[in-house]
């Protein structure tokens, strides 16, 4: 997810600056929009924008999207975590990483109701403590998600290009240890967000905002520093590592017709690699627009128009939508997840199918039956 920075603003006066007109949403705490109250700078001359020019339809659509993300994301990711814990066969190294990704996504979907509320109220009504928690979750999700996807790509690279080393490296235990390390590393940002996050009364607009509170004298510098660090360490470097890993894997897959001694193992290897690639690609597609938007705004090159602000809203919504897409991808692209999902959702039907399959198998293998020349099974 994207980093929290600026959160929510209240009803402006007759006119407002582009930054002030930004939506009062959860995405508002992305470190993408500097406060126009003297603590930050918009990076360019303010262009007055009538509030009426920002259609309320946009806020309604975004709120509806957040509601869908909340339901689908929370239920879907919780189901993913459940099947990995419940079924022994699902406890593979790759699925341990998927569990970590689902945990981060499930956490951030719990913030959707708060963000939707502030979209509609134009102010943060939930207090200082919850403000810190929500901002921290946003940062944790952003860093743990991209770090986990990076490790999944490295894991696939080792499995495809170094199958011998993979026997020692690719174990569920080591995957769990790496997941713990990812959360510890992400805590350097998440805990900082808890310390710096808080509510602030905007007296000029008579509303409460939830944001990272930088020192007034150096607000612009810290705001820019945060945006650049997030862009570099939570996007550029991980994506470059992922690109290198998959480039090497593609070269390997093209040069070798059979990666392992078994065609079945080879199919599974390619299937899992394809699944991870699709998950990574969807993440990059969902998050690239808002990362670019925030970086451009930080450099002071954003066009402060209604179209630009509307694009900003939808870029953020697209990023959060990613948290609800992964369970759907698993269900369509991975047979094991699909089977476990069906087993959980339709236990009676699946039990009857297994019993039917078992009876057919036992009938075929029953020594009381012999196969005649015409191919018909008849009892002896």
Curated annotation (Swiss-Prot):
TM region(s), chain numbering: 58-85, 96-119, 133-154, 174-196, 223-247, 275-296, 312-333
Gene coding for it: OPRK1
Stated family: Belongs to the G-protein coupled receptor 1 family.
GO (cellular component) term, any one: neuron projection
SUPFAM superfamilies hit by this protein: Family A G protein-coupled receptor-like
Subunit structure: Interacts with NHERF1. Interacts with GABARAPL1.
Lipid attachment, kind S-palmitoyl cysteine: 345
SMART domains: 7TM_GPCR_Srsx
Residues bearing attached sugar chains per UniProt: 25, 39
GO biological process terms held by the UniProt record: adenylate cyclase-inhibiting opioid receptor signaling pathway; G protein-coupled opioid receptor signaling pathway; locomotory behavior; neuropeptide signaling pathway; phospholipase C-activating G protein-coupled receptor signaling pathway; regulation of saliva secretion; sensory perception of pain
Keywords attached to this entry: Behavior, Cell membrane, Disulfide bond, G-protein coupled receptor, Glycoprotein, Lipoprotein, Membrane, Palmitate, Receptor, Transducer, Transmembrane, Transmembrane helix
Role according to the record: G-protein coupled opioid receptor that functions as a receptor for endogenous alpha-neoendorphins and dynorphins, but has low affinity for beta-endorphins. Also functions as a receptor for various synthetic opioids and for the psychoactive diterpene salvinorin A. Ligand binding causes a conformation change that triggers signaling via guanine nucleotide-binding proteins (G proteins) and modulates the activity of down-stream effectors, such as adenylate cyclase. Signaling leads to the inhibition of adenylate cyclase activity.
Subcellular location: Cell membrane
GO molecular function terms noted in the UniProt entry: dynorphin receptor activity; G protein-coupled opioid receptor activity; neuropeptide binding
Extracellular side: 1-57, 120-132, 197-222, 297-311
The protein's name in its UniProt record: Kappa-type opioid receptor
């Amino acid at each position: 997810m994207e980093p929290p920075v600026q959160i929510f603003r209240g009803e402006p006066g007759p006119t407002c600056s582009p930054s002030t007109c930004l939506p009062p949403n959860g995405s508002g705490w992305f470190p993408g929009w500097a406060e126009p109250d003297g603590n930050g700078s918009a990076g360019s001359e303010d262009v007055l924008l009538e509030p009426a020019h920002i259609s309320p339809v946009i806020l309604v659509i975004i709120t509806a999207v957040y509601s869908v993300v909340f339901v689908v994301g929370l239920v879907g990711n919780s189901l993913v975590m459940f099947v990995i814990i419940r079924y022994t066969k699902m406890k593979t190294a790759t699925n341990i990483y998927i569990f970590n990704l689902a945990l981060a996504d499930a956490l951030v979907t719990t913030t959707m109701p708060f963000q939707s509320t502030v979209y509609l109220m134009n102010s943060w009504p939930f207090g200082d403590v919850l403000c810190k928690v929500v901002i921290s979750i946003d940062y944790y999700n952003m860093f743990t998600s991209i770090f986990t996807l990076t490790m999944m790509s490295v894991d696939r690279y080792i499995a495809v290009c170094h199958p011998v080393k993979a026997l020692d490296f690719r174990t569920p235990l080591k995957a769990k240890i790496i997941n713990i390390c990812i959360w510890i590393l992400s805590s350097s940002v998440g805990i900082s967000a808890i310390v710096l996050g808080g509510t602030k009364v905007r007296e000029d607009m008579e509303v409460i905002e939830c944001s990272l509170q930088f020192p007034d004298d150096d607000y612009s510098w810290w705001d820019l520093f945060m945006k650049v660090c997030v862009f570099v360490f939570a996007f550029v470097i991980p994506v470059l590592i992922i690109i290198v890993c998959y480039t090497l894997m593609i070269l390997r897959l093209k040069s070798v017709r059979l990666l392992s001694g078994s065609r079945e193992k080879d199919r599974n290897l390619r299937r899992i690699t394809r699944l991870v690639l699709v998950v990574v690609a969807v993440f990059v597609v969902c998050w690239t627009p808002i990362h670019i938007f925030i970086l451009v705004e930080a450099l002071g090159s954003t066009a402060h128009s209604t179209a630009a602000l509307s694009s900003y809203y939808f870029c953020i919504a697209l990023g959060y939508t990613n948290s609800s897409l992964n369970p759907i991808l698993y269900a369509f692209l991975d047979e094991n997840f699909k089977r476990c999902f069906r087993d959980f959702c339709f236990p009676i039907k699946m039990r009857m199918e297994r019993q039917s399959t078992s009876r057919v198998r036992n009938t075929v293998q029953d020594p009381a039956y012999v196969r005649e020349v015409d191919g018909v099974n008849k009892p002896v």
